[in-house]
Design a protein with these regions (language model features):
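Short alpha-helical DNA-recognition segment
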Residues: 34-53
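Short amphipathic recognition helices of helix-turn-helix/homeodomain-type DNA-binding modules
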Residues: 81-84
Length: 84
């Protein structure tokens, strides 16, 4: 039984709003720390194009990636996922 969802399909379709918030926050924190996409990618051991795709709302990131991003940007996962 799914709580708060009408169907299994609803569970699989992530909110684009959450991706937009994450994209905006990653970009804002990256710029706040004076980091290029490449520098952030290096700190996270990710590819530069992956960071770019997060900032363009093209990726659904894993919890592990969220953790690494938050640590590299000196913030927390909840901060990356909340509107500012």
């Amino acid at each position: 039984m799914l709580l708060g969802c009408q169907s299994q399909k609803a569970v699989r379709k992530p909110s684009s709003n959450l991706r937009k918030i994450l994209a905006s926050n990653v970009r804002a924190y990256r710029k706040k720390h004076g980091l290029s996409q490449e520098a952030l990618a290096d700190a996270c051991e990710l590819h530069r194009t992956y960071i770019g795709s997060i900032e363009r709302c093209e990726r659904n990131v894993t919890l592990s990636t969220l953790e690494v991003l938050a640590k590299s940007l000196s913030t927390t996962v909840p901060e990356l996922l909340t509107g500012r």
